[in-house]
Amino acid sequence: MAIVGLGTDIVKIERIEAHVARSGDKLARRVLTEAELAIYIAHSQPNRYLAKRFAAKEAAAKALGTGIGRGVSFQHIHIGNTPDGAPTIRFTDGAQQRLAFLNGVFGHISIADEKSYAIATVILESC
């Protein structure tokens, strides 16, 4: 096994709150998959949830070496949780193609937040 990609992103939660106050759910609908959007809508702290998912997807795009764009969309990166609450990451479409190009087979993700910030790190691994 080898590391083929590493990415980290940090988001100021206040920035997400300001964007949502100005534009409603526009950012959430651009960043989140349908499954993630359903969780966001029902979440007790939706802006914090959105900030963590935004950081996670940006970190994943950095690990892929593309950033968002250039064939990789927010919609191609799916962030979930195990039954125990640990974050999971899954790639589809352009993100999956880029992972295959890197000979990657699996992504590891860590997401954390505190009062003002959300941060995520993604490690991509080959077999």
UniProtKB/Swiss-Prot annotation:
It comes from the Bacteria. Pfam families: ACPS. Signal peptide: none annotated. It is found in: Cytoplasm. Keywords: Cytoplasm, Fatty acid biosynthesis, Fatty acid metabolism, Lipid biosynthesis, Lipid metabolism, Magnesium, Metal-binding, Transferase. It is an enzyme of class 2 (transferase). Its cofactor is Mg(2+). InterPro entries: 4-PPantetheinyl_Trfase_dom, 4-PPantetheinyl_Trfase_dom_sf, ACPS, Ppantetheine-prot_Trfase_dom. One of its GO terms (biological process) is fatty acid biosynthetic process. Its main location: cytoplasm. It catalyses: apo-[ACP] + CoA = holo-[ACP] + adenosine 3',5'-bisphosphate + H(+). Mg(2+) binds at residues 9, 58. One of its GO terms (cellular component) is cytoplasm. Its EC number is 2.7.8.7. Belongs to the P-Pant transferase superfamily. AcpS family. Transfers the 4'-phosphopantetheine moiety from coenzyme A to a Ser of acyl-carrier-protein. HAMAP family: AcpS (MF_00101). This is Holo-[acyl-carrier-protein] synthase. The lineage of its organism: Bacteria, Pseudomonadati, Pseudomonadota, Gammaproteobacteria, Alteromonadales. The gene is acpS.
